[in-house]
């Protein structure tokens, strides 16, 4: 119905599975060792949790094979605040499985003291389950090879009316919801590549409807217009599998009101071409860079907080708690020194440990601004900050105290962070790993193996330009999954991981399942997996309708 607040739909599940098998994930899943691993996990899981199939009254495989076409799950609300659930499954010729499933539902409801009746809604037969322990008793329709389950007679009548073609003008459908259609228009793909799955979520309408009569919740909701959050409309998107030239494409759209006010007025994104900085190595697994007009956002923040706290109160708090104690002016000395570009890169610090992935953040500064001197003065106030130099680059290393390690103790599975702060060119660079910092400075000084010069990044960047058309990017991302996948394989295959699972298997059935599976598992080689991998990227566009994200992964060049 029109007032649907949450929705997930797979247009055709068998086609979805077939297309998924053409993607990197599907091809990795077809690896002999991965298939053996998953088969072992499935068997061990069902052995550890026999109640699943006992409750279903059929093998899990049989239930999973039921959908033969569209699958849709939705949640809608009524004007009085009731929540209605909806499930649709095209089961095709799987009528025997459907009958078995409904037979088991009959048994469960009757065993609970409920009843099972058949009623006619217009010209359609509806199975009504009256469950005394659940107010949302299901109603089931079986028609034209399709199973529909609802939890509200209003929803049932709505479905039947549209199915029979007798719907009135008041019985509007979700396809008439302007928020939904606007989001889907931004997420439809091309004629050659239609979405295989789509989704939608409208949290404000859901909360507003379900908190009727709750004074505290309604009081909180009444604040939203004051801070501008009532301008958040909804979000949704789609997934396209194995379209021409790509592995996957995804769309996510956050719909925002025009004009933006309050909190939403802090989303003052700029634009840029996203060329990686000269200190970003080519072997980073992930790179994100975005543009945000901080000074404009800060002014809007002052306006917002003055509305909430009172005129001038925010500035008073900043003066008392920041400016005066540090002898600095937040607005003039820091905010105005930022050029509006922010970057995050990751790197895997060897050897493989649970937190081997480190991060580096770059904040671009305006040329000639005094922020550089102010920053160094503030860092020197930190007692555990040690000034160092590497490759003619000064930096500060934050010395985190660590307990002494006993002789003969095996290497820790946890990496001890070694934070660093530096001014590199016109950037503040912060990282949690000194090894990563030095690796980046090697790249910066040598000019070799830079991400900006890599063929993989150039390819992703060109596809981003193609996706943008006339638009401008406010944020771009780049990812190459090899090192992260290698880290996962190293951790999974580590004897200490197996020992941990074995030691805790008696206290957790699930850990016991993992212990049994991993104890005898043969892991695939990296070469077998990486031939199915290719770089991926995404872009964020800030326009008058809201924020739109386009993500994609490329088809791998195999063999």
Identify the function of each model-found stretch:
Residues 1-128, 132, 175-236, 241, ...:
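Structural boundary/hinge residues at secondary-structure and domain interfaces
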Residues 17, 168, 526-527:
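Extracellular or lumenal secretory-pathway regions
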Residues 116-120, 138-141, 239-241, 384-389, ...:
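Short, exposed beta-strand/loop patches in secreted or surface proteins that constitute
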Residues 122-136, 393-416:
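Short, Gly/Ser/Thr-enriched beta-strand-loop segments that form substrate-interacting elements
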Residues 136-210, 410-511:
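A conserved glycine-rich beta-strand in the N-terminal activation segment of trypsin-fold
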Residues 359-363, 427:
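Ordered core of a single globular domain
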Residues 364-396, 444-453:
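Active/binding-pocket-proximal capping segment
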Residues 522-559:
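C-terminal regions of mature proteins
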């Amino acid at each position: 119905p029109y007032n649907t607040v949450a929705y997930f739909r797979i247009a055709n599940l068998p086609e979805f599975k077939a297309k998924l098998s053409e993607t990197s994930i599907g091809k990795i899943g077809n690896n002999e060792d991965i298939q053996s691993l998953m088969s072992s996990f499935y068997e061990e899981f069902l052995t550890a949790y026999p109640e699943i199939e006992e409750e279903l009254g059929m093998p899990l495989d049989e239930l999973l094979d039921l959908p033969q076409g569209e699958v849709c799950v939705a949640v809608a609300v009524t004007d009085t605040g009731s929540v209605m659930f909806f499930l649709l499954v095209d089961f095709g010729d799987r009528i025997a499985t459907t009958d078995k499933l409904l037979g088991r539902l009959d048994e469960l409801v009757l065993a609970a003291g409920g009843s099972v009746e058949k009623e006619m809604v217009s010209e359609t037969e509806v199975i009504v389950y009256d469950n005394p322990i659940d107010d949302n008793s299901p109603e089931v329709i079986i028609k034209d090879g399709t199973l529909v389950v609802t939890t509200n007679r209003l929803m049932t009548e709505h479905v039947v009316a549209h199915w029979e073609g007798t719907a009135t003008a008041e019985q509007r459908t979700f396809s008439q919801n302007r928020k939904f259609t606007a989001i889907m228009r931004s997420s439809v793909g091309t004629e050659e590549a239609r979405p295989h799955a789509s989704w939608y979520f409208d949290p404000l309408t859901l909360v507003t409807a379900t908190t009727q009569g709750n004074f505290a919740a309604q009081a909180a909701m009444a604040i939203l217009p004051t801070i501008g959050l009532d301008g958040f409309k909804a979000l949704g998107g789609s997934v396209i599998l194995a379209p021409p030239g790509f592995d996957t494409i995804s769309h996510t759209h956050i719909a925002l009101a025009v004009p933006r006010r309050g909190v939403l007025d802090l989303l003052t994104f700029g634009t840029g071409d996203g060329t990686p900085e000269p200190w970003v190595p080519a072997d980073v697994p992930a790179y994100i860079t975005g543009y945000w007009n901080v000074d404009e956002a800060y002014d809007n923040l002052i306006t917002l907080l003055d509305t909430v706290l009172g005129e001038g109160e925010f500035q008073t708090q900043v003066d008392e708690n920041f400016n005066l104690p540090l002898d600095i002016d937040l607005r003039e000395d820091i905010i105005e020194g930022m050029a509006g570009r922010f970057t995050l890169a990751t790197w895997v610090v060897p050897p493989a440990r649970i937190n081997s992935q480190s991060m580096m953040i770059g904040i671009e500064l305006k040329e000639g601004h005094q922020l550089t001197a102010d920053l160094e003065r503030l860092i020197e106030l930190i007692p555990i900050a040690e000034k160092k130099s590497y490759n003619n680059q000064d930096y500060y290393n934050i010395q985190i105290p660590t307990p002494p390690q006993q002789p003969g103790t095996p290497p820790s599975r946890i990496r001890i962070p070694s934070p660093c702060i530096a001014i590199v060119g016109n950037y503040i660079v912060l990282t949690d790993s000194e090894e990563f910092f030095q690796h980046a400075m090697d790249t910066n000084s040598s000019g070799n193996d830079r991400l900006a010069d890599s063929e993989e990044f150039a390819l992703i960047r060109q596809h981003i330009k193609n996706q943008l058309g006339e638009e401008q990017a406010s944020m771009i991302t780049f990812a190459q999954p090899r090192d992260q996948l290698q880290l996962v394989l190293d951790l999974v295959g580590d004897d200490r991981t197996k020992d941990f699972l074995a030691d805790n298997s008696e206290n957790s059935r699930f850990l016991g399942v993992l212990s049994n599976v991993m104890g005898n598992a043969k892991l695939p080689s990296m070469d077998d997996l990486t031939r199915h991998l290719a770089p991926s990227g995404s872009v964020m566009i800030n326009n008058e309708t809201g924020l739109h994200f386009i993500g994609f992964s490329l088809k791998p060049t195999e063999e």
